[in-house]
Amino acid sequence: MANQMLGAMVNEHYGSEGLLDRILTVARETGIEIDEARSDDFSAVSEFHIGGRKATIDLGNMAQLSAGDKVLDVGSGLGGPARTLVEKFAVLVEGIDLTHEFCLVANELTRITGFSDRAVFSQGNALSLTGDSEHYDVVWTQQSCMNIEDKRRMLSEAYRVLKPGGTFIFQEVFAGDREGAIRLPVPWARKSEMSFLWPAEAIRNSILEAGFIENIWKNVTTQYLEEYRVTAEKTRDSMQSSTLGVHLLLGNEAKLMRKNVVDNLSKGLISVYQGVFKK
């Protein structure tokens, strides 16, 4: 599929006019003082990956991030993980995302929570990074590769912009051990044309072929499955009670999408891995 066509599909899937207003309206209704908001006040909507904010912190610890590290967050979404990394590890983050609306919301939530001097977001493409070669200490991605068809090119770009000795760290959804079509819709795709899930070992080999050295390769499917099952149930409750949640960006299908993720994980059709690799 042509990159331009896929990009349009991704923007249509995730993009939602008025998203910022919806988030702030619901935040106020739930008692959040916007002028005093903290990063974790928005985590239910801005860290909607499997494992949520806890998984972000786990990854940061796994990567042994250091204060002042320059981090490129590929597929930065609403900026939740970036703000968590800034808050917990004192790093500097540049986030890129294919979805224009996400970047607008990410920058505003970052301003509101007081991290604008340490995290900034712009529209960009993982297949053609604008950063200089050997510029970043860390390239970070959490569940953005499912929408990327040309994964080898993405890995090549990640390798290019990393400094020698830099760290590539990820949490991603891969194909599971059981063959078969996944149940749709899921949070990253309403149609099969948007979902590109490779087997874990194929990804692992491609990372090594790109030049990276493996430090950690970890199947965390079981670790996060039950937790995500609870999260999926809470999605229904948050939709009914007008609290912050992924339904604000994915709409009325959010509950079904998360239920399908649980089903796909339980049946072995998809898996979740974390990895740390060095350049």
Mark where each language-model region is.
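Conserved alpha-helix/loop element of class I SAM-dependent methyltransferases that forms part
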Residues: 49-67
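A short acidic, Gly/Pro-enriched loop at the edge of an enzyme's catalytic core
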Residues: 127-138
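A short glycine-rich, Lys/Arg-flanked "PGG" loop and its adjoining helix->strand segment in the class I
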Residues: 152-167
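Conserved Class I S-adenosyl-L-methionine
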Residues: 216-279
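N-terminal auxiliary segments of SAM/dcSAM-dependent transferases
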Residues: 1-28
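Short alpha-helix
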Residues: 195-211
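Class I SAM-dependent methyltransferase SAM/SAH-binding core
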Residues: 70-74, 78-128
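Short, glycine-/aromatic-enriched active-site segment of Class I SAM-dependent methyltransferases
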Residues: 173-194
